[in-house]
């Protein structure tokens, strides 16, 4: 790997507009990975007209669970699903752009099986040991719960727990991407079928994890509805798998110099 080593240089520096300006003006490809505020700031610095630019701003992710198939699971499968969801959401305390904050339950609700999911998620949290909220986390979570309940009319019901807290929504707002708290806090919404979720998919949505749907069902949904958002659709448990296709970009092709010779 000597060739790769010699062709790479990693630079770390404190916030310095002059350095960012110098690098931006000389690069052939610029990748900006950060918050919307960071993206807006760095885009102030001009690049060459031939420079390729890939932008990875704030994103929001959610899960879609088929209640009809969910309620048919065997008891041991609930914990298996909960552990997979735990890895998606809580391994990095919901800070990953692909970690779900919203769960959309699709189909006929079965209260018993629905409660089993949350009971088993609490078990997965206790067994996993990666997600251990401290007192400040708990206070911040409760404070945010009160803020949403007081200010947002979309809130139908709130359930506050030691590890996991939830808010059930009457409807999904257009600014759903600001409905994020972290610390094991999830928003929930119930729909009868896939057609009902089109309006909830904003351009900010990155990853949709799913359980209980056939790949063909989701493929038909995408073809039919052509949602503005969603760049990835993967099974629950695979939200954090990074690949060469990310945020709608083919990273290898977009970051390569391609010469068409015929």
For each predicted feature, which ranges?
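Short, conserved catalytic or adaptor-binding loops enriched in Gly and charged residues
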Residues: 1-4, 45-46, 178-179, 224-226
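Conserved NAD(P)+-binding/catalytic subdomain of aldehyde/semialdehyde dehydrogenases
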Residues: 3-102, 107, 237, 245-262
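NAD(P)-dependent aldehyde/semialdehyde dehydrogenase
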Residues: 92-209, 216-261
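Short, mixed-charge, low-aromatic patches
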Residues: 33-42, 70-78, 151-157, 174-180, ...
């Amino acid at each position: 790997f000597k060739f790769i080593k010699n062709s790479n240089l990693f630079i770390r520096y404190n916030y310095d507009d002059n350095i960012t300006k110098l690098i931006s003006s000389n690069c052939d490809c610029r990748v900006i990975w950060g918050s919307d505020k960071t993206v807006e700031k760095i885009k102030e610095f001009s690049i060459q007209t031939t420079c390729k630019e890939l932008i990875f701003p704030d994103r929001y992710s959610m899960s879609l669970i088929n209640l009809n198939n969910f309620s048919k699971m065997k008891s041991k499968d609930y914990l298996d699903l909960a552990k997979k969801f735990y890895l998606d959401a809580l391994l990095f305390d919901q800070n990953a752009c692909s970690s779900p904050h919203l769960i959309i339950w699709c189909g006929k609700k079965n209260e018993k099986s629905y409660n089993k999911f949350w009971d088993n998620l609490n078990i997965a949290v206790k067994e996993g040991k990666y997600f251990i909220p401290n007192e400040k986390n708990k206070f911040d979570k409760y404070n945010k719960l009160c803020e949403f309940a007081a200010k947002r009319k979309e809130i139908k019901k709130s359930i506050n727990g030691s590890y996991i807290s939830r808010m059930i929504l009457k409807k999904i707002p257009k600014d759903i991407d600001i409905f994020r708290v972290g610390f094991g806090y999830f928003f929930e919404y119930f729909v009868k079928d896939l057609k009902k979720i089109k309006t909830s998919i904003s351009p900010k949505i990155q990853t949709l994890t799913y359980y209980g749907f056939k790949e063909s069902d989701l493929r038909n949904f995408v073809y039919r509805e052509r949602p503005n958002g969603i760049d990835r659709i993967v099974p629950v448990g695979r939200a954090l798998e990074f690949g060469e296709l990310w945020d709608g970009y083919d990273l290898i092709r977009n970051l390569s110099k391609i010469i068409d010779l015929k």
